[in-house]
Every structure is written in C-alpha cells, then in structure tokens.
Amino acid sequence: MATSANEMKRNDAREPGHAPPPSPGVLPALDTDVLSNDAFAFWKLPEKWREALGSAIVRSRKEAEWYLFESYRPSSSGRQPRKIRAYYAIKPFIPTALRQRMRSLAVRACSVPSFPAWPCESALLELWSEWLEGALATLGQSDLWHIGFWPDGRNCCLVLTHDVEGPLGLERMEAMADVEEKFGFRSVWNIPLDQYPVDWHMVERVRARGFEFGAHGLRHDGCLFRSLKDFTELAPRLESLAREHQMRGFRSPSTLRNIDWLCTLNFDFDSTMADSDPFEPQPGGSCSIFPFFLNQRMVELPYTLPQDHTLTNLLRRDPLPVWMAKVEWIAKRGGMILTLTHPDYTGDAANLHKYAELLKRLNDLEFAWRALPSEVAAWWHKRAALQLVEGRDGPSVSGGDADRVVVKRVSAEPMMRGKFSCSES
C-alpha cells in the first residue's frame, strides 16, 4: 500500500497550524514488548489479509505511536522541565486560592497550541481511517469484516473517573457516588496514597457498591517523575501501597509523566494521558479517543473530556456545553468518553448539579457501553488476543473467548462516516 499518497492527502487536508504527520526520520523505534498499536490491530481485520498489508501495517504502527507516545514533543534528558520543578518547590508556601487565581490568569493569557488541537484533535482518527481506505484499495475490496471495538456491538464506551485531591474530596465522595448510582453509573476514585489520612472503611463501603479505586500517586508534590532517582526510590512504595489496597489502575498526580518510566510500573492500566490537554503543567496528549497499549501488560485509557477543574477554575467557563460538544464528537466516532472530575471541586453544592446534568445527558446516549476502567482494560486485552477468520460460512472469531464479541462491517463504524471537525473550542 502506498502510504506516501495518504501522507500527501493528510498534509493537503490538514487545517493550518496542525502538526504534520510524522516523517520517517522522527518515527519511534518499535518496542517488541508493546502489544501492537498498528492499524491492522486497531481495526482487527481478517487474518487472511495480513500478509498483503505487511509493510503498511508496520508503517502504521510507527506513525500511530508517534502520536500515542507523544513523540512529537521535544525530547528531554528525562528530568522535569525547570518551570515544573520550580512550581512544586514554592507550591506549599502559596495559599490555594491565590495559587488557583495565578494559574487561571496564566492559562487564560496563553494561546492554545494548534496541535494537539483542543478540545478535539483528529490527527490519529484521520490516520486510522485513511489507512483503512488505502487497505481497501490495495486489496481490491469495497468493505471488510472486523471485530467491533466494544462488547455486544455497542456504539461507544463511557467511563467515569475521579481524582480525590484531599480530605474534602474524600468527604464528598459518597454523596457524589449517590448521584452516579441514581443514573445507573459506577466510577473509579483515584486516591493519593501517602498525602492525607484516608478512611479505608468508607473506601470499602463505596467499593462494595460496585465502584473501583485507583492509585493517584503518593503525593501531589511533583516528585514521582521529577528525576529517575526520585522515580526509582518512590515507585516501590507506590506499588506496595496500591497492592495493599487492591488498586490495579494508576493516574499520575497533575498528569505529570515520563512514558518510559510509567511503563515500568506494575499496574494493569493507566489513565494519566489525555487525548488533548494543553492546560496541564505538562501539556500534550496521545491524540487518541480509544484505549491503546503501553506494553504487554498495561493499557492506557486516555481521559477524553476536559477536566472540571480546568473548565471551572482555570478557564472560568461553564463546563456543560464544552463537555457535551466533546461527548457528541466522540460518540459520533465510536470512541471512549472518559471523564476526569474531582469531588473536591465538583462535589460541592454549586457544581454538583452540573455534574448531575452531565450524567443525565450521558444516560441518554444510545447503545453506549458503560464500563469501569478495569473492564475496559480487560476487554482491550481480550480483543487484541482474538483473530478474525473468514471461511465459507462467513467470518468467525478464534484465539480466545468470543463472548460479547460482535463482528461488523467496517463501513458500519461511525468513524468511517462524516467529518472530524469539532464544534466547540
């Protein structure tokens, strides 16, 4: 398949300011320890076509991981940028209200980068869809079977996540969980494991109701990814406390990250990365509204809705219109709607009604798969292990448990219909 034609098409069609697709000289080397993030594995096409698409498959993985692993960002020695280290050095001495005011002024004074675009970045979606169009042309086919992205043929996926920043957020957790239960949802609560006293009896009460808990690092002090020395010293305690409290998922405090180091942590899934978030201390994003693999074990579940704190406290915007524009954009493309809210902020009376309104509207999404992060990670592993075989009697699935697996035509996928533009910015 001639990928150069697709690259030319992508360059010609891209809006001004967007990052160009990766060129061969900057593509990351393939890591054989990573379960494949190539286009063939993404679409899960019939195995009989793999050989004919061989070189295009390899190329697609390199291109995809250029986005997924943020290879478009300037390389560094591994140390945090100086401004992040300086911020965390003075953070304890600045009152919270003043700190948020200063961050809000700084964020609103800066222009939003054109890539990754916010709140919607379509570069990777374009790569997936254009690769498939090229594959169809190479194979002389007008349509192909594939393993559907979500269980039971669901149209999209819906995941609720929270980061519990402090004791106030912990106090508000049960009331916020009540609101979610009212609409038939369950969520995950990520807790810093060495920052403040945690009422583990309350945690177990909420867990018994079907909610999950994850590790939100040790402290909000910027230390975990500050340097390799810090990471090497802190990671064992983080993993030990997470095991003690039966936490198999992770999100880094303030979404600070070094992807190479992150991949060494002993968790089943991570949700540190966004698809696009220019407002975090470490801006960027994976450009993905679907899960992907960090290595053989760990699945990345990028958060795909803007954070409540970002919209309400920093940008001073009504979150609901931005949330719903992004929800509609993701749902129309069959992706994963993954929220990131904080009971510390959204759990108060002034904001909880807006969160309830979000849940009410999410409840109206037709044929969406409501799942906990652990369920999505398990599903993505299961789907990756399966193979699609075409025989005289039609397509069939082999290689593992096919329960809840639905085989569909790629032409039926929302991603293959319509444009990728987003109405809210």
What do these predicted regions represent?
Residues 160-165, 213-229:
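Glycine-rich phosphate-binding "P-loop"
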Residues 210-220, 267-284, 293:
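Acidic, His- and aromatic-enriched active-site or binding-groove loops in soluble protein domains
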Residues 201-202, 225-232, 261-263:
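Metal-dependent catalytic neighborhoods of phosphoester/phosphodiester hydrolases
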Residues 1-190, 195-198, 243-244, 263-266, ...:
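Terminal accessory/targeting
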Residues 253, 273-275, 304, 342:
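Conserved residues at the C-terminal ends of beta-strands
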Residues 191-199, 248-258, 275-276:
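Short, solvent-exposed turn/loop segments enriched in Gly/Ser/Thr/Pro and often Arg
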Residues 231-242:
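An active-site-proximal "capping" alpha-helix that borders the catalytic cofactor pocket
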